[in-house]
């Protein structure tokens, strides 16, 4: 085929919206080869301005989209790169379960930091529902897909004039992080933690080697490329195991597996989901307390923004579990160990910017579950809880500022050489916000696969009041009087006794199914027997719920059976707007909240007043 004909076909494909990657797949080529060919043929995107003022007067803060509409390039491109120093921030793209609006918070704070430093802030994002894509947030906005092709196109265009200092990938969630190495190989400077160190944290085998070298405990595990390897690893470390594909966000395709049959079934599903990456198998630490830590590092000094204790048990995805700052049940030696491990990891990975580390504590041993060399979904929560803008600090560090200088204005405590931790003034609780009302038929039970799409915060002087506020913020108003229905799986029956006892003391009337009612009565707690759905199709718990006689539902899942009684009860609670709880730790926290509200007032602050109190201004 002659070059003119090739040029005509390739241009037509680009006009129709085919990406370089799609064209490469169709032709059996590499994406870079298609890119090089396209550029050789002078098929280059131009950027058109969206006039935010509708031609009424000149747009001062325009934003752009790409188009392939002509061979004439320079005359029709409207992006007009400035001659300033500039930085590109990659946004997080569409909101979906696992990657939500929380990441946009970090992108916006990065823009604010760059503006304070006199550097032009350029955002690439394609989600109109975010603050970062408001045309007056950044100096320049490119409304483009978060892909290697589009980011590199924009970087090359902006390099033509002024000084492009680099690209920030830390604030765009996993989508942006996955582009780091390819962009570096294409000659783009990645600001902050290097792509090699990002990979050392993201690649499970590399990270496992690092933990061994640092003498930091980790849950036993392995990487399987076949069903046979998976069965062998699970047999070696013992069931239950947590299985998941590599490189995921939001716990997609993640599952706790209790037997060989379950594992075989999972492998047949997950390997199809994840052909490019192997399946990871870890020992599941039952009844462990999970922790999250958000930290900022300049390669040497470390600031720990907060240690967050998960309220739900291990096995509930970190994005779905309620968390509390400061930790409520951990002894000082555990806190000290977590601080030590976080600082060691930050330095070993040479983190420049943000780091999130997830831990599990079992039998006094602190295990590292994973480290994420990027902004986590908890950065807004931590920043608001302790009054320190972590994303802002991280951005300034990426551009050469030293952490020790930046934290002088904040209330932090030095806990080791070049290690500080923020001092929270209040109890702050994050609660997940779920979309179940908009998803008919979905079981609201919590597990390792993430289901939430947002989060809310409750802040007060003690745990109970803060938890009550967090539930209110997440659209779940806990009752302080009324009827409670309790039905829990066998392994939870001994743990529900204290919860039921407290609810009875607080004046609630308890309804329960046969097995749960028997255990409660044996422990001196009166319970009204309610028939299961399968026992009586017309006179059962669902009828009581529909008649408005139930004010709180406590129901834990009994297993994998898709349409169990528990499923119908939980689903009815969602549809009828009845507060429901699906974990024992969640039930214990709710009881503390109800007791706190029954015995005292909730503290009420304006946002300005609360912000000033958190920052120690009065």
Curated annotation (Swiss-Prot):
E.C. designation(s): 6.3.4.16, 6.3.5.5
InterPro entries per UniProt: ATP-grasp, ATP_grasp_subdomain_1, CarbamoylP_synth_lsu_oligo, CarbamoylP_synth_lsu_oligo_sf, CbamoylP_synth_lsu-like_ATP-bd, CbamoylP_synth_lsu_CPSase_dom, MGS-like_dom, MGS-like_dom_sf
GO BP term, pick one: L-arginine biosynthetic process
Molecular function (Gene Ontology), one example: carbamoyl-phosphate synthase (glutamine-hydrolyzing) activity
Domain ATP-grasp intervals: 208-399
Name of protein: Carbamoyl phosphate synthase large chain, C-terminal section
Reaction it catalyzes: hydrogencarbonate + L-glutamine + 2 ATP + H2O = carbamoyl phosphate + L-glutamate + 2 ADP + phosphate + 2 H(+); hydrogencarbonate + NH4(+) + 2 ATP = carbamoyl phosphate + 2 ADP + phosphate + 2 H(+)
NCBIfam families, per database record: PRK05294.1
Gene this protein is translated from: carB2
Binding site for ATP: 244, 283, 285, 290, 315-318, 358, 370
Residues binding Mn(2+) 1, per UniProt: 358, 370
Originating organism: Methanocaldococcus jannaschii (strain ATCC 43067 / DSM 2661 / JAL-1 / JCM 10045 / NBRC 100440) (Methanococcus jannaschii)
Residues that coordinate or bind Mg(2+) 2: 370, 372
Keyword Heme: no
Cofactor annotation remark: Binds 2 Mg(2+) or Mn(2+) ions per subunit.
UniProt binding sites for Mn(2+) 2: 370, 372
């Amino acid at each position: 085929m002659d070059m003119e004909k090739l040029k005509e076909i390739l241009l037509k494909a680009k006009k129709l919206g085919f990406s370089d990657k799609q064209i490469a797949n169709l032709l059996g080529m590499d994406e870079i080869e298609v890119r090089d060919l396209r550029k050789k043929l002078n098929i280059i995107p131009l950027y058109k301005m969206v006039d935010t003022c509708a031609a009424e007067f000149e747009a001062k803060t325009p934003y752009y989209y790409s188009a392939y509409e002509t061979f004439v390039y320079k005359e029709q491109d409207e992006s007009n790169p400035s001659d300033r120093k500039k930085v590109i921030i990659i946004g997080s793209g569409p909101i979906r379960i696992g990657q939500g609006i929380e990441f946009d918070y970090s992108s916006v704070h990065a823009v604010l930091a760059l503006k304070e430093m006199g550097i032009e802030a350029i955002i690439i994002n394609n989600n109109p529902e975010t603050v970062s894509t408001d045309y007056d947030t950044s100096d320049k906005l490119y409304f483009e897909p978060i892909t290697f092709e589009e980011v590199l196109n924009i970087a090359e265009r902006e390099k033509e004039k002024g000084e492009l200092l680099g690209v920030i990938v830390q604030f765009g969630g996993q989508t942006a992080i996955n582009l780091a190495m390819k962009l570096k190989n294409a000659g783009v400077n990645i600001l902050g933690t290097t792509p090699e160190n990002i990979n050392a944290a993201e690649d499970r085998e590399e990270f496992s080697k690092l933990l061994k070298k640092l003498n930091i405990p980790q849950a036993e595990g392995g990487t399987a490329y076949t069903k046979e390897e998976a069965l062998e690893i699970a047999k070696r470390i013992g069931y239950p195991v947590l299985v998941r594909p590599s490189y995921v966000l939001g716990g997609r395709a993640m599952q706790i597996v209790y037997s060989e049959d379950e594992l075989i079934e999972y492998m047949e599903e997950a390997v199809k989901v994840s052909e490019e990456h192997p399946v990871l198998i870890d020992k599941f630490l039952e009844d462990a307390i999970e922790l999250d830590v958000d930290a900022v590092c300049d390669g040497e000094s470390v600031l720990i923004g907060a240690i967050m204790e998960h309220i739900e048990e291990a096995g509930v995805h970190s994005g779905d579990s309620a968390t509390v700052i400061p930790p409520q049940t951990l002894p000082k030696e555990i806190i000290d160990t977590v601080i030590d491990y976080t600082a060691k990891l930050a330095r070993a990975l040479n983190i420049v910017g943000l780091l999130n580390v997830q831990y599990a504590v079992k039998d006094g041993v602190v295990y590292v579950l994973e480290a994420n060399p990027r902004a986590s979904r908890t950065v807004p929560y931590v920043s608001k809880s302790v009054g320190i803008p972590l994303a802002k600090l991280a951005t300034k560090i990426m551009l050469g500022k030293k952490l020790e200088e930046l934290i002088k204005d904040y209330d932090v405590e030095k806990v080791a050489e070049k290690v500080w931790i923020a001092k929270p003034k209040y109890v702050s609780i994050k609660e997940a916000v779920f979309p179940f009302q908009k998803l008919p038929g979905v079981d609201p039970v919590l597990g390792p696969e993430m289901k939430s799409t947002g989060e809310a915060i409750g802040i007060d002087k003690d745990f109970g009041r803060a938890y009550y506020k967090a539930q209110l913020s997440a659209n779940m108003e806990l009752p302080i009087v009324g009827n409670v229905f309790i039905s829990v799986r066998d392994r939870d029956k001994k743990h529900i006794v204290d919860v039921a006892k407290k609810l009875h003391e607080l004046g609630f009337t308890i309804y329960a199914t046969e097995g749960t009612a028997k255990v409660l009565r044996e422990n001196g707690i009166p319970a009204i027997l309610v028939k299961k759905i399968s026992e009586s199709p017309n006179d059962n718990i669902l009828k009581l719920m529909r008649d408005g006689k139930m004010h709180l539902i406590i129901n834990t899942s009994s297993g994998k059976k898709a349409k169990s009684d528990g499923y119908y009860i939980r689903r009815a609670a969602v549809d009828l707007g009845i507060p429901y709880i699906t974990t024992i730790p969640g039930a214990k926290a709710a009881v503390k909240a109800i007791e706190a509200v029954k015995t005292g007032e909730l503290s009420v602050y304006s946002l300005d007043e609360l912000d000033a109190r958190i920052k120690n201004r009065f």
